[in-house]
Amino acid sequence: MASAADSLAGASKTDVPLVGWIDRWIYVFMAALFVATTLAGFIPDSLVKIASVEAGQRAPFPPVLHVHAVLMGSWLMLLLAQTTLMATGNSAHHQKLGIASFLLAPAIIISGIVLVPTMYAQVWNAAASAPPEMAEQMRGGLAIRTDIMLLQLRAGVLFAACVFLAVRARRVDSGFHKRMIILATLVPLPASIDRITWLQHTMPQSPLSADLYTLLLLSPMFVWDLFRLGRIHRAYIVWFALWLPASVVVHQLWSSDWWQATAPGLLGYS
């Protein structure tokens, strides 16, 4: 008579209850992890900046910053809701709620396009009008902002590309679709990670830590899929094919004389 262990060994991974449970809830975990990362980064940072605004030490937040924050927060909440609906078997509600992503994703991209030059203009104007004793410090801040623009450009382009690929695959490859949506959301998370002060960072000297923490955030889903499937899912291959070259460009241009001289001109400053 076969033992219980023999039966378990002969069963497929989907026949094991725990495996099936993790299959459903790993995406909820990833969405919740992204929400927690965002809150850990932005809440303390925002409180400090609000205090600086109230003390007259920095310019008020531009309206587009509030718009972008609300849109990104809505996207994260939508992701958490959508993954929970699928984990609990409510696919019909998932499909209906998914319509919101068709509005949110373009709005996030557009607000980001407006936000980047708006924030750069604030730093540029502050540096230009700074008193002599603060001029050097302000120029250093402007150089950092110029480098950060590289991460923002990468995030905007890759977020748009990944969402497009995910939406295109939603009816023909649900596995690719759900993973690519997670991967799309992962792309802009360095903005949160870099604000978590109790983490070790290489910023602003190098974006290496931002990229390593991004991969660390991805690891639970990636490792589970590797165990579960016994191979690297196509969604990761496509994502890395986009993310890796873009990251190489970011690292090559970071703090380079060419980028520091060219970037202001792209935004109309010289």
Each PLM stretch: what is its role?
Residues 2-270:
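Alpha-helical membrane insertion/targeting regions
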